[in-house]
Amino acid sequence: MSTNQSRTVFDATAATYDRDRMKLIPGHEAFYAAALELIPTDAMSIAELGAGSGLFSIMLRAAFPEAHLTLIDFSEKMLELAKERLGDDSRVTFTLTDYTIDPLPRNCDAIVSSLSIHHLEDERKRTLLRSILEALKPGGLFVNADHIAGPNAELEEVYQLRWLADVRALGATEQQISDSLYRQQEDRRSPVAAQLAWMREAGFADVDCWYKYSSFAVMCGVRPR
């Protein structure tokens, strides 16, 4: 899909996005916790790519109350929801932009992303990783908590069947599942191994996958000092 089509998908589902997400991410508490735990406690400048409605942003604020957060998203309706959550906080900057096109904030202690980058084609992921590396301070880190693809077609099918079983067990309705599958038209998920290789190729050090449950993973890399 084009950027405009992508924006339309997320604008259309913004109102129900948060309600649905908790039932559509098996093990969501461990997934988000793993991402938060990787960020150094003294991080003072954190940028979030694809902040959406601010669901992960509010967790960042709770974990890092003194840090300045820059929340970046290209969906105006999603960012409006984030402002409702965090709009009174003077240490939060809301940026309506496409993070794959426009410059990222510089000298960040950490750049994080949650369930966003998997919408990009592989080459755009690789280009973005280079931009992220340049935007970090030496020693800064990038954390990507994302929806990933299986390493082969057989495991991808297993992932999908497990996801359907898990979300139904969590109480997701068939409408919520249908809406999620509609959003997944936008997905361009990539396997963990490929993404870790691209991070190393971009120049990141200490690259690893720190959490994985089926098709959800948390990956991290550090800009060398």
Show which residues each predicted segment covers:
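A short glycine-rich, Lys/Arg-flanked "PGG" loop and its adjoining helix->strand segment in the class I
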Residues: 126-138
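Class I S-adenosylmethionine-dependent transferase superfamily signal
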Residues: 35, 60, 132
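Conserved class I S-adenosyl-L-methionine
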Residues: 1-40, 55
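Core SAM-dependent methyltransferase catalytic element
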Residues: 205-225
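Class I SAM-dependent methyltransferase SAM/SAH-binding core
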Residues: 47-49, 53-101
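C-terminal alpha-helical "lid/dimerization" subdomain adjacent to the S-adenosyl-L-methionine
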Residues: 145-201
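Residues lining the SAM
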Residues: 113-117, 145
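A short acidic, Gly/Pro-enriched loop at the edge of an enzyme's catalytic core
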Residues: 104-111
